[in-house]
Amino acid sequence: MAAPLPRSLSCLSRAVGWWSRQPILMTQSTAVVPVRTKKRFTPPIYQPKYKTEKEFTEYARKAGLVIPQESLERPIHLACTASIFDAYVPPEGDARVSSLSKEGLAQRTERLKKNVASQLSIRRIKESDPNFKVKDFPEKAQDIFIEAHLCLNNSDHDRLHTLVTENCFPDMVWDIKYKTVSWSFVESLEPPQVVQVRCSSLVTKSNTYGQVTVRMHTRQTLAIYDRFGRLMYGQEDVPRDVLEYVVFEKHLANPYGSWRMHGKIVPPWAPPKQPILKTVMIPGPQLKPGEEYEELQREAHKPQLA
């Protein structure tokens, strides 16, 4: 039994020796190693409990909830127009040219054409405002004009909003925040007169606006002071004759609307306005610490002995 063991060992040694004598071949092998990455999250598909909006609304009503209706439309409140449509053009020299001359005849013909358009507009205004009368309107317009300008004296902007339109309000209060306005009405040189009436619609045919142009020849006083109390424009004790063409507007579609001042028409032949008096600061003397300006004035005016 001991003889076969050495024979098997010799066979194994021969095989190992033969394998060791073989040339070694260098080969490259690719290995795929699985690497775990971050798993992407996919949200589940949302399945609403109520498939239609009607089912959701019915369920909310049963639960006692009131869902406000969402509207993509934004309402716009058009209380007034943005400008004066078909503005009245005052004739040269306030129509004082003789009707026998060529210029006077042309002015009279143009006035007749405008009167026809004014009569049609008056008819449309009376359909919405039956109380409108051309004879009574000038006095009412003059009262609105006087009260609106008196609101500038005490800066009553709340009352001014009810007398002028949103288009006219910025023009009246512009650049008078730090100023003092003193305006007064002296007298009316000529009775106010309606020179033009226009009626137009905006956005829709039923949304109509009426504009009435009133000629006013009055005597007024105006003085504007800056924030330091220095006079910038006009004089309080010197009245001046003023010829103005004032436009009044009313939103006829609004049953609670009223006539308000909308703007003024300045004719091209009107005289230029008085320029504003500009005030400048005069630099005083440089004071040392502890000195006062009054002491320097006393020393400057102190009599000197000869």
Swiss-Prot record:
SUPFAM superfamilies: NTF2-like. GO terms for cellular component: mitochondrial inner membrane; mitochondrial large ribosomal subunit; mitochondrion. It is found in: Mitochondrion. One of its GO terms (biological process) is mitochondrial translation. Keywords: Mitochondrion, Ribonucleoprotein, Ribosomal protein, Transit peptide. GO terms for molecular function: structural constituent of ribosome. Pfam families: Tim44. InterPro entries: mtLSU_mL45, NTF2-like_dom_sf, Tim44-like_dom. Disulfide bonds: none annotated. Its main location: mitochondrion. Component of the mitochondrial large ribosomal subunit (mt-LSU). Within the mitochondrial ribosomes, required to direct the nascent polypeptide toward the tunnel exit and position the exit at a distance from the membrane surface. Belongs to the mitochondrion-specific ribosomal protein mL45 family. Component of the mitochondrial ribosome large subunit (39S) which comprises a 16S rRNA and about 50 distinct proteins. This is Large ribosomal subunit protein mL45. It comes from Bos taurus.
